[in-house]
Amino acid sequence: MLNTFGDTFRVTTWGESHGKALGAVIDGCPSNLPLTENDIQYELNRRRPGYSLFSTPRKEEDEVEILSGIFEGKTTGTPISCIVYNKSQQSKDYTAIKDTPRPGHADLSYQLKYGNYDYRGGGRSSGRTTIGNVIGGAIAKKLIEYTHKIKVIGYTTEIGTIKGDFNYYNNPEFFESDLNIQKLSNQIEDSVLRCPSTNSNEMNEYVFKAIDGKDSVGGVVEVVIYGLPKGIGNPIFNKLEGRLSSAVMSINSIKGFEVGKGFESSRLFGSEMNDEFYFKNGIICPKTNNAGGILGGISTGAPVVIRASIKPTPSISKTQETVNIKTLETVPIKIGGRHDPIIVPRVIPVIESMVSITIADLMISSGFINPSKLSNI
């Protein structure tokens, strides 16, 4: 089982949903980066359960403790180790279904591959393990913003069959200045679904309807990388979009990924899809950004635009059919415990984290960030 992501900026995550604790070890972060537990806690608070209208009732504070790698408020270049203790497990909720793999979950595939599987809350396959992703992502996000003022911002564009009216292509002006991006960030965080669209209330009603029907819903998240320099990524087998898709698709519940116009580009003429170039203050710029900031696997300097589709939460209160792996019989199953009717808004900081880790990794390996130490900026 591979638990480490990255080449030069490496994040190793560990822990299970109902274990004693979870955490991450970050290796390859340069020294001299100002970093506190508050930097990490802010991102963990955005991901944590039990504190929003559509979140699981399982309340966890998810308080992070930095164990190593920081001295006098700055990174030392040594591994940064962080831990978060679980405090609200209810493992008894899973005893009755330990031999009956839950539809839509990784129970069966983990059992078949590893045999000894921690069934409590999904164990290592649980979405709760993304705490480690967010710890690493918080540090990566701080690094790329501190050194190059790069911002990674995600938001909901669709919930179920309801499409929002806000996206990068409808509202490019929001990504033209730091001030506009801050305004957008405030709008996103003020929304229970992290959706800046004017019809987000319609999405809320859609989720309520699913809850009433003992069901769950999914959605689509768009992420924009603002301020990424030209020249990040490599052609052929190490393309920027390939690295980003690998990072995002590693997250539980992600079932689709696209860049720029994505699948819509297959329905356009070349004359509609191509981004023409012009000079702006002596710099070559695209008139449009249908490519999503990437050409030939390399960043163009325009905002990088990606989207990910998130499946409905597999734990639902409806009775379903499964099998008992001990008796070899088909049996009904009804999932108890505490679960999210929708995980889209909580997945957004996880996607931002994996994107930030990828960008930090590439910025270091491409020579944009000194791998040893940062100068006083």
Swiss-Prot record:
Its cofactor is FMNH2. Keywords: Amino-acid biosynthesis, Aromatic amino acid biosynthesis, FAD, Flavoprotein, FMN, Lyase, NADP. FMN binds at R124, S125, S126, N252, S253, G296, K311, P312, T313, P314, S315, R338. Reduced FMN (FMNH(2)). GO terms for molecular function: chorismate synthase activity; FMN binding. SUPFAM superfamilies: Chorismate synthase, AroC. This is Chorismate synthase.
